[in-house]
Amino acid sequence: MTTQAEKPSVEAVEMIAVVIDGFEVSVPKGTLVIRAAEKLGIQIPRFCDHPLLEPVGACRQCLVDIEINGRKFPKPQASCTIPVEPGMIVNTQLTSDVADKAQKGIMEFLLVNHPLDCPVCDKGGECPLQNQAMANGNAESRFTGYKRTFEKPINISSQVLLDRERCVLCARCTRFADQIAGDRFITLNERGALQQVGIYEEQPFESYFSGNTVQICPVGALTGATYRFRARPFDLVSTPSACEHCASGCDMRTDVRRGKTLRRLAGEDPTVNDEWNCDKGRWAFKYQTAQDRITTPLVRNAAGELVPASWPEALEAAAAGLTAGRAAVLVGGRATVEDAYGYSKFARVTLGTNDIDFRSRVSSDEERAFLASNVIGNQTSYRDIDNADQVVLVSFEPEEESPIVFLRLNKAFRKRALKVHAIASKLSIGNEKLKANFICVAPGNEVSGLSGLTLTEKSVILVGERAAETPGLLTAVSGIAARSKAKLAWIPRRAGERGAIEAGAIGNLLPGGRPVSDAAARVDISAAWGVHGLPEARGLSTNEIYAAAANGEIKALLVGGVDPLDGSNTSIALDALQKSFVVSLEMRPSAVTDRANVVLPVAAVAEKSGTFLNWEGRGRSFDIAIPDSIQRSDLRILSVLADQIGRKIGISTVAQAAAELNSIGTWDGNKSEFGGVNAAPAPTLSGEQALLTSWRRLLDNGSLQDGEANLAGTARKTVAVISPKRASAIGVTDGDLVKISNEKGALVLPVLIEAIHDDAVWAPRNSAGSELLRTLGVASNSVVTVVKA
């Protein structure tokens, strides 16, 4: 017999009644007057006020007439800074001549130096200043002098432009940078009439979140270089969308004109991204219109050349090649849930194999077992981060690998001093902002960093995909979470990886987290799919598939959205692609299409509908933003290819795939056991040897960032990081060049001396001049030589 758990006590909220324009409303104590008015549907004009920023009362546009218990304030007050009080009576511009006159006066004052260039301003048509000047301002200006002018525009970064004469000094941008992003690169300079938004000398606005300042600017003072002078809001067709770049799960909006994406904006979802997004999600969409976009099927002819072909010709060639021998499926980590489910079903039903893996990166068998036992059904969420007593980061850099997670951590740190522990070899910029407890360990020895932590049921462990590179680390993380009852979440970099697990796009799991090895699970899926049986053997991993293809055991590969150069066995991967019959589903030329026998063009995110599951397992559905696109989704192509082969998968639309996957549901039987792996012994270093550690930066050489030069302009500088002790030993100072090498290759980078383990050297994994996997063949925990160049 079990007893019901005691419900946590809910603290009573003190309510205060206030009268606004003759209407009474009760709101929680501490509510600002401007928010109380909104409860009644009364709109008080404002510019500086923003519900997610601390009140500042900078613009004075929200002045109202207030009295408390019969005593009137001597002057109108800023409703965005004053909380409600018992006995308060508020009269807004709707019922008070005093408030109306004050607001008109402020509006007239703000427009004295404003250029009134609405016809050419990007904000025209969606501008709060324009709207409120019409609604709350005077019909004509009394000003007859010369307006103040500035050089325009000035670049405060490569992607954000500032027109200073339009600025109303609301301080939204500076407050966002400081309070939300933790990037104090932008400030209000000078005083009085000379005050203006600016950056520090020789320090551009290099923030991963700078685009949010453009979106929340209430005038056209801040504009994005990509969208400037491109369209009016009423020219655009807006569609709710989701971000394809990481697993944060941001709500987004895509704006299209004449079949072309012109801008993307952060949507509003308080449970995930509030109303923010990162610059990569906002501006990295031009890959969709790249000049080298594949738009027609290609088939390799007898001369070895890829030539355009019709869809029937390409499908016939693909079907023949995939059925000529043993085949396997590789699908990248950016597929939608529906597309991943299509690959999963195609592998089992059409090809009769469990040889499928979505992990087109450095991975391990330990990780595969961990995903099956710890991720399926895991319900750790952003709310758990908000309520955590401490958060532990293991092989995970939130600012670089899941930016909205970083913003939520920063929010909790600012509001209640959340304690963050970072187990790593190098102290990152993001963790410095969070004032994290830096547990410095040698690369590959992260397990030791867990031993000194005292965790509780309210603690949260966030482990990144790079934990797969350290043997025994996922085992240790799983163990400490089980013993302490702390919440555990796995946060990959790519948007589609959590959904791929749920869809069964991995060799040890069927859809819904059903173990391939479980007979009941196979019967379950066989019945759902209407087939007489499914393959029983556990499928091969990505590395095993490449190895089997390279030695001839696997004859054909179906590859969707995979870059073989993202893994650690690049030479074997390329050899496998060269020797196999390859069918590639891809948008642009790649190392796969260069070796493919058949290339089938697929739709970009804006050209199809679907769903991404974020790291929480939360579905983020999106509609087609460019409905006239002729490109087909992966799912649609897989469906017609299965028809061509003669073993149909029976799902050709997103709605069909989603309905079928939802009807299957999550497995409620026994999960796969996670036996665990022991940690590897630490290597012995000598002389100039060091252990390499790295991660991918948010803005790097990723192909989905291609075509957006302005975004690349704010990428962090490529440097090698070593400790003061190592710098002294090899005789270098900041800015000197160092050479990092191993038996495969070498790279030369400027050095930065800062907080890092003495045995370690850090370099970005995939940035300009530092493509570690391609140059050195390794990314982390490997011995390299570091010398002065």
What are these regions (language model features)?
Residues 2, 44, 344, 399-414, ...:
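A cross-kingdom feature strongest in bacterial/archaeal respiratory oxidoreductases
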Residues 348-356, 413-419, 478-490, 578-581:
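Structural alpha-beta junctions
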Residues 388-389, 434-435, 456-457, 554, ...:
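Short, well-ordered alpha-helix to beta-strand connector turns
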Residues 2-38, 46-50, 66-73, 87-452, ...:
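N-terminal export/assembly segments and adjacent metallocofactor-ligating motifs
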Residues 258-275, 280-289, 297-299, 310, ...:
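Long hydrophobic segments that form regular secondary structure
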Residues 59-82:
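N-terminal single-stranded DNA-binding subdomain of primase/primase-helicase replication proteins
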Residues 328, 390-392, 460, 556, ...:
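Structural motif
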Residues 374, 428-549, 648, 665:
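Active-site phosphate/pyrophosphate-binding segments
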